Amino acid sequence: MPATAISELRIAVKSSLTPAELDDANALVSEARWNQVAADWRLFVEHGRVYAAHASCGRIVATSAILPYGQHFGWISMVLVGGPYRRRGLATLLMRRAMDDLSAARLVPVLDATPDGRAVYGALGFMDCWGFHRLRRERQEARRVDPVLPAGVSVRPITDADWPPLCAFDAAAFGAQRNAVLGALRGRLPAADLVAVETDRIVGFCLGRDGRIAAHIGTLVADNDAIA
């Protein structure tokens, strides 16, 4: 593909994804060896914004996405570029589009960077704030484990009655309301949908999601490490 072809790509904001477009987006995820599935794309389409670069044939060859959180910041994610289109400035182009829209909404852009993406983001003015590790546990035979809990704390499946105080607990810890995101996660990995309670007060919770290559545990929010 000639370098000048980048300028011929059509950048579109997607209010929905057709089955063919979803196949294209999932192919980018697979190529990058990421874990997202169709439900994750739907989350961004329904509650945020997805940007897609279309080749002349109509196929999606690159993406980025944003997810606003409250009135303070927005998350940039799903920055994916197909192999033949890499190292031609397309990731930067899609990032700038996402950043411009967040700035227009007076939201601070935030993201987490893979090692490959960090150089791109640093050139755009992003700075390191914190680091994290993504851990993987190989599949093992299922067995029941009774956790050692702090005195007075119990853990049980999340109920509908838990949901409003759970979302309030999360917002206080996270710094913004993200009820829609939590609601989209709930039920995707039912065994992970747990709440920790101490004398009728929520002191922690966990959600999860199914993935392309692994079940993902998180969001996990707790008052302390022992509860987590």
Per-range role (PLM):
Residues C129, R134-P164, A168-D170:
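Surface-exposed beta-loop interaction hotspot
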Residues E31-R49, T63-R86, L94, M99-D100:
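Basic, Lys/Arg-rich alpha-helical nucleic-acid-recognition elements, primarily the DNA-binding modules
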Residues G48-V50, W130-R134, A191-D193:
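Short hydrophobic/aromatic beta-strand or adjacent loop that forms the aromatic wall/cage
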Residues S77, D112-A113, I158:
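Small/polar loops that bind or transfer phosphate-bearing groups
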Residues P2, A113, L124-R144, R209, ...:
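Active-site/acyl-donor-binding loops of N-acyltransferases
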Residues I60, R88, T92-L93, A104-P109, ...:
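Conserved active-site alpha-helix within GNAT-family acetyltransferase domains
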Residues M1-R10, S16-D23, L43, A55-R59, ...:
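Intrinsically disordered, low-complexity, positively biased terminal segments
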